[in-house]
Amino acid sequence: RNRAAAGEDSPRRGYVADALAKRRWSPVAPGLRQLVLAESGAMTARLFYLAPGTRVPVHTHRGQELTMVLHGAYSDECGTFARGDVAELDDAVTHQPVVSQEGDCVALAVTDAPLRFRNWAVRLVQPLLGI
């Protein structure tokens, strides 16, 4: 029986929550924080926390990005993504994720190259943000 599908807590949920609580979330922009989980070469896995109504700056990708929504929802030029949905993006997609006003959003994102932002000011601080 699938406990998660039945809406029950997984026995690992507490373990994962405790492990994440010991790590430091880094602010990226107002309403946006990240927690880098793993890095290997250019590949990075991170969690993003986005407050309700947060707009991520317009960007494309230098490589591939896979994003899975763990909580909440966001919309962009590709559609609306809610809990359990996965977005697969590459350099052919330019988008601006916008979080639903109804609640916050937590997403797991794995990239194999840095993002490419359109706004020059964001590009200027991008190395400092590690994104």
State where each predicted segment sits.
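Ligand-binding loop in jelly-roll beta-barrel domains
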Residues: 93-117
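Short peripheral tails and domain-boundary helices/loops at the edges of structured domains
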Residues: 111-131
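A short glycine-rich, His/Asp/Glu-containing loop-to-beta-strand
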Residues: 21-57
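Glycine- and acidic-residue-biased ligand/ion/polar-headgroup-sensing regions
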Residues: 51-54, 60-76, 84
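Short beta-strand His + acidic residue motifs that chelate non-heme Fe in jelly-roll/DSBH
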Residues: 56-59, 77, 95-101
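Positively biased amphipathic helices and basic secretion/translocation or surface-docking motifs
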Residues: 1-21
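Short acidic-glycine-tyrosine-enriched beta hairpin
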Residues: 40, 76-96
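Short, charged/polar surface micro-motifs in flexible loops or helix N-caps
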Residues: 41-44, 52-54, 73-75, 93, ...
